[in-house]
Amino acid sequence: MQRRKGATWERELAAHLRSEGIQAQRGIGQARRSSEVPDVDVAGWWIEAKRHQRTNPKAALQQAIADAAENGEGRIPVAVCRDNGQPLQAATVTLRLGDWIQLVRDRRIVDTVAKGFV
């Protein structure tokens, strides 16, 4: 049952990301490959999707970090966690501080260029 619930959450998350204009699909390679694949495949990201009674974002992020280091080809590890009974919008996203800082810097560069300050 846990595996089925996890697969359902991965499909739901991928569908939601697609509805937001992000190219995403469920990573189904665990059964087909010898190497690990992200739960949800989005270019540049290693997404570990967890859904439990009480999720553990820190443990999920540690799994994403380990898997991305071994198989991620430079992808940023991130954990997307949702507790049972909560709506999708209540899901949390956890990533390392350094990765978040880089995202803020990258966004600042994009905003600066868009405003014509460069």
Give residue ranges: language-model regions:
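Catalytic phosphate/metal-binding cores of nucleic-acid and nucleotide-processing enzymes, i.e., regions
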Residues: 1-118
